[in-house]
């Protein structure tokens, strides 16, 4: 028992000794560990403080300037709108197995990509079939354009006058010749010619003229629509009798003008179109809006119904597809718009196609314009009994009135009405007119560019008021913008009566009636 106790005591002593020794060793080992933990804790505390300071700096830092916000917002709007349905070649859509992919250089024609920023979205929907047919036409343009192999083959046949001579290209052409220097009529006529080319699967070639390339961007990717200057018949375009009686089966000449003879009007008859099917080159001289007459050709009717389920949208969609202002003209448009029209809540266009003739008639027309505008809530009423609007009815809504007229007097009178008198509800009204010149009389160089800019600005209006005497310029404007204008009624005995104006039934150009053709069918 004593041995056992002794052993036990020894063991206890050993254990105690070991414990003390282990404790010492453990303490020795723990010292550096505690030091490391303190260091890590300090680092963690520093990181936490740094994190808090960074968060505070993010919260309390100065907000970005308004300019940055506006720039970023404008960029987002632009990117968003560029993907909207603003025209066939700007968007990327898929129709069946057909991809419509942009293939233009943006910088060469900014208006093609920026138009939706200045004009409100069209209330009309373009048919998917029109998208499809335009894409097919662009394919035709790439295959049959000037100086392509197909073009050269067809040109060789024209020179030889032999239909059976050499390889067949499969390309047919319609050459549009302008017979009217007026810009508006040129655009109406050219849109009509393009629809004819679309319906007959012909390549449209456009006579260059003195200013066409200065006014309009190329509408089709990769290939020009302008007739090459070296085209062999260029020198004979004014010799109509020579073209009619050339005896060359490869070319036909047709003259479509408002004063066409009965024989020339037969162009819109089915039999005439059948005869032209085998003719590779058709020279078409036109001076007016003949698009409505194409709806009378029986073989075109079904195709037109598919292209334009709403018949009166034809010019609207075709003009937006074809007519893109060049960068020079686009600069005129955007600078004016941004300076005078952009900040307004509403933009009202007024086209006055009547020259100033006598004080009494002049004042009657001013009164009628104002009466029309106020009756239909386009223009605000003025309070001639007060110097300032009542603070009880203060309305800060702004309206910009854009006046297009060759006579400065109308602009000055309407401007003075809103300058000299407060509006009843306190609206802010600004009245603008870009120029006093008559563009119609000098359709070239800068005057044509300004005329095109003015047409475009009118098309950007939210509402449009026009005099009863129509102009091709305003017809293009409301057709391009998809607007049904308010048309002033003709005054009786120089005095206007109710109704002062009526809203047009269509957005299409309508002052030029469909050509009566007298076809047997």
From Swiss-Prot:
Top-level taxon of the source organism: Eukaryota
Cytoplasmic side stretches: 1-39
Biased composition (Basic and acidic residues): 1-12
An annotated GO BP: cell wall biogenesis
Positions annotated as glycosylated: 152, 222, 493
Pathway participation: Protein modification; protein glycosylation
Transmembrane stretches, start-end: 40-60
GO terms for cellular component: Golgi cisterna membrane
Renumbered residue ranges of the record's region Disordered: 1-29
EC number: 2.4.1.-
Tissue: Expressed in roots, stems, leaves, flowers, siliques and seedlings.
Residue intervals on the Lumenal side: 61-521
Keyword field: Cell wall biogenesis/degradation, Glycoprotein, Glycosyltransferase, Golgi apparatus, Membrane, Signal-anchor, Transferase, Transmembrane, Transmembrane helix
Membrane topology category: Single-pass type II membrane protein
Pfam families named among the record's database cross-references: XG_FTase (PF03254)
Subcellular locations according to the entry: Golgi apparatus, Golgi stack membrane
MF (Gene Ontology): galactoside 2-alpha-L-fucosyltransferase activity
UniProt keyword Transmembrane helix present: yes
Family classification: Belongs to the glycosyltransferase 37 family.
Protein name: Fucosyltransferase 3
């Amino acid at each position: 028992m004593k041995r056992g106790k002794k052993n036990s005591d020894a063991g206890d002593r050993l254990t105690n000794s070991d414990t003390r020794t282990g404790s010492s060793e453990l303490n020795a080992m723990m010292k550096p560990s505690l030091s490391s933990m303190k260091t890590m804790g300090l680092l963690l505390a520093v990181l936490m403080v740094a994190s808090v300071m960074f968060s505070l700096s993010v919260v309390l830092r100065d907000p970005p300037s308004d300019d940055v916000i506006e720039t970023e917002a404008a960029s987002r709007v632009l990117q968003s709108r560029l993907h909207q349905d603003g025209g066939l070649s700007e968007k990327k859509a898929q129709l069946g197995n057909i991809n419509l992919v942009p293939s233009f250089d943006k910088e060469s024609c900014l208006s093609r990509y920026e138009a939706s920023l200045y004009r409100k979205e069209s209330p009309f929907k373009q048919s998917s079939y029109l998208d499809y047919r335009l894409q097919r036409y662009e394919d035709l343009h790439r295959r049959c354009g000037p100086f392509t192999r197909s073009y050269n083959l067809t040109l060789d046949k024209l020179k030889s006058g032999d239909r059976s001579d050499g390889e067949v290209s499969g390309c047919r052409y319609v050459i549009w010749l302008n017979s009217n220097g007026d810009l508006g009529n040129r655009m109406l006529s050219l849109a009509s010619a393009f629809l004819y080319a679309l319906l007959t699967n012909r390549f449209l070639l456009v006579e260059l003229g003195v200013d066409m390339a200065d006014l309009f961007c190329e509408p089709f990717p990769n290939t020009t629509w302008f007739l090459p200057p070296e085209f062999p018949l260029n020198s004979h375009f004014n010799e109509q009798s020579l073209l009619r009686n050339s005896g060359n089966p490869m070319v036909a000449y047709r003259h479509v003008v408002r004063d066409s003879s009965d024989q020339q009007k037969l162009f819109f008859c089915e039999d005439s179109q059948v005869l032209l099917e085998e003719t590779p080159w058709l020279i078409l001289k036109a001076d007016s809006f003949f698009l409505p007459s194409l709806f009378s050709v029986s073989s075109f009717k079904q195709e037109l119904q598919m292209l334009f389920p709403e018949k009166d949208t034809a010019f609207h969609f075709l003009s937006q597809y074809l007519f893109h202002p060049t960068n020079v003209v686009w600069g005129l448009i955007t600078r004016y718009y941004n300076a005078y029209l952009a900040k307004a809540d509403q933009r009202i266009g007024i086209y006055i196609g009547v020259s100033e003739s006598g004080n009494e008639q002049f004042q009657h027309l001013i009164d009628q314009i104002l009466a029309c505008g106020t009756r239909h809530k386009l223009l605000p009423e003025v309070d001639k009994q007060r110097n300032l609007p009542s603070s009880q009815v203060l309305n800060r809504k702004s309206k910009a009135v854009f006046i297009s007229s060759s006579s400065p007097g109308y602009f000055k009178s309407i401007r003075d009405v809103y300058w000299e008198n407060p509006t009843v509800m306190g609206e802010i009204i600004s009245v603008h007119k870009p120029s006093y010149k008559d563009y119609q009389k000098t359709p070239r160089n800068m005057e044509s560019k300004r005329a095109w800019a003015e047409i475009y600005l009118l098309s950007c209006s939210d509402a449009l008021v026009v005099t009863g005497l129509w102009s091709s310029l305003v017809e293009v404007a409301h057709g391009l913008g998809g607007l049904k204008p308010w048309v002033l009624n003709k005054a009786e005995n120089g005095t206007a009566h109710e109704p002062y104006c009526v809203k047009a039934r269509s957005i299409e150009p309508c002052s030029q009636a469909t050509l009566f053709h007298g076809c047997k069918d």
